[in-house]
Amino acid sequence: MPAVDIPGSKSVTARALFLAAAADGVTTLVRPLRSDDTEGFAEGLARLGYRVGRTPDTWQVDGRPQGPALPEAEVYCRDGATTARFLPTLAAAGHGSYRFDASEQMRRRPLAPLTRALRDLGVDLRHEAAEGHHPLRIEAAGVEGGEVTLDAGQSSQYLTALLLLGPLTRKGLRIRVTDLVSAPYVEITIAMMRSFGVEVAREGEVFVVPAGGYRATTYAVEPDASTASYFFAAAAVTGREVTVPGLGRGALQGDLGFVDVLRRMGAEVEIADDGTTVRGTGSLRGLTVAMRDISDTMPTLAAIAPFAEGPVRIEDVANTRVKECDRLDACAENLRRLGIEVATGEDWIEIRPGTPAPAEIKTFGDHRIVMSFAVTGLRTPGISFDDPGCVKKTFPGFHEAFGELAAGWGIPLTPSR
């Protein structure tokens, strides 16, 4: 059976870099993701004075529980949301003056709930242009800790940032969450903090994080489940079979739950200890599914929805409107370009069955739009992309890996460029 080697998880790599930088000692990360986002995170750590050593398969980070080594720094976060949200939080635990900026795309993405919570904890933080957006400056003097209330209804990354900060504060944190999206990503954070020596307690909607810092370790990064979704969907939509090694029972990432959606649609799914296999059965059923907890895979499902035998309705995904682009509108626009009937609302999209026609996909610079509609291209020769290279954000080698899988199945692909 074809097996695809999926690069390391972006979300796990970003958290691991934060934890390694904050830990006491030298941490080795095994098989981290090397992409524009994670390289930007590592570059940001270096700008703050952390030492990050790299070999082809590992990164070593010299931790500094006391915070950044440099008293002043300017950090450019590129397009990375984790970089733009986690690094200012890490810097706040230190002592110095730190300025953060990001790409135009990232400047448009919201930050206000996190920066409001940091200010409530006493952090001297100032937005230099639009309130709640980059660029921003932090005059760091450590964080005392205590109680704080957070709205994480737009992004679970706000909560993750505060959870990661907790052990670096003097008193620990008690975080009351009023709303939470993509909850499985928070479970990733808590599990990884445990690997670095910190146990988070949850009391309903309150998360209690002790002070005391992190201890260095060797940490293996599992394959990216969001990236794997394109290959699983490819098998389901073509009636073929694919296995992703290293992503099986016990995986941290909630986005592996996408295979349960494929199972509901009629695909055969086998989750073993050491990997996951999806087999297409030649047909896909329509369905209605809430994807709030696995919303990064919403475009994957939208891209294969026309091939289902009935309508596909995806609900509870309002947060996808504030990603790299408005993904609900981007999916709808591109499906219409392909001749597919689509309806959308504030937090939903409904896609009717149809036969997509060749067209150029408008990517909006969003890696997930490209990778999702590449799956559509397996059944629709002639699909192309206005910016195929934006996949470098999470999987620089995507087109080659996807083309190799398709060739192994005997399916010719239109060149992406």
What label would you give each PLM region?
Residues 1-417:
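Short, structured segments at the rim of ligand-binding sites
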